[in-house]
Amino acid sequence: MRAVIQRVTEASVTVAGQVVGAIGPGLLILLGVNQTDTLDDVALLAEKIAHLRIFSDEEGKFNLSLLDTGGAALVVSQFTLYADTRKGRRPSFTAAARPEIAAPLVDTFTTALRTYGIPVATGVFGAMMQVALVNDGPVTIVMDSAELRLPRRAK
């Protein structure tokens, strides 16, 4: 499971001219699901994101998490995070999970964030969406559950 996490002052997602999800300060999370992802990937990523300290404290240091700030999350499913551009000029998305697998895992991810007490808004799975955001910082982090399981390199 792969997430592009953007710290925002506000973000919204629109489908067919209607705003379907919007937040104030918090995180916009673009979420992609891989063919091999499981509930373990959901739990790992949700826990890491909820506790990730990427908000500044009074001294300007990254010491606060989404939980600490009381911010919200806007979760938008995005299969294109698994684009393979190694061959040709048109990306392949064969690594992305099929919708019948991905949709329940995205729903479970949003539920997992809510269990931490985080207010969560969402896009519409599989819809053509327009995402608007004001990136704060900017702070943008890419996180992948497969990489989180790898051992850290020794210095």
From Swiss-Prot:
UniProt keyword RNA-binding present: yes
Record-listed E.C. numbers: 3.1.1.96
Top-rank lineage group of the source organism: Bacteria
Segments carrying motif Gly-cisPro motif, important for rejection of L-amino acids: 137-138
Catalytic activity: glycyl-tRNA(Ala) + H2O = tRNA(Ala) + glycine + H(+); a D-aminoacyl-tRNA + H2O = a tRNA + a D-alpha-amino acid + H(+)
Keyword RNA-binding annotated: yes
Xref: InterPro entries: Daa-tRNA_deacyls_DTD, DTD-like_sf
Keywords: Cytoplasm, Hydrolase, RNA-binding, tRNA-binding
Places the protein is found: Cytoplasm
Gene Ontology cellular-component terms listed: cytoplasm
Molecular-function GO term, any one: Gly-tRNA(Ala) deacylase activity
Gene Ontology BP, a term: D-amino acid catabolic process
Family: Belongs to the DTD family.
Domain notes: A Gly-cisPro motif from one monomer fits into the active site of the other monomer to allow specific chiral rejection of L-amino acids.
Described purpose of this protein according to its UniProt entry: An aminoacyl-tRNA editing enzyme that deacylates mischarged D-aminoacyl-tRNAs. Also deacylates mischarged glycyl-tRNA(Ala), protecting cells against glycine mischarging by AlaRS. Acts via tRNA-based rather than protein-based catalysis; rejects L-amino acids rather than detecting D-amino acids in the active site. By recycling D-aminoacyl-tRNA to D-amino acids and free tRNA molecules, this enzyme counteracts the toxicity associated with the formation of D-aminoacyl-tRNA entities in vivo and helps enforce protein L-homochirality.
Quaternary structure annotation from Swiss-Prot or TrEMBL: Homodimer.
Name listed for the protein in its UniProt record: D-aminoacyl-tRNA deacylase
Organism of provenance: Chloroflexus aggregans (strain MD-66 / DSM 9485)
Gene: dtd
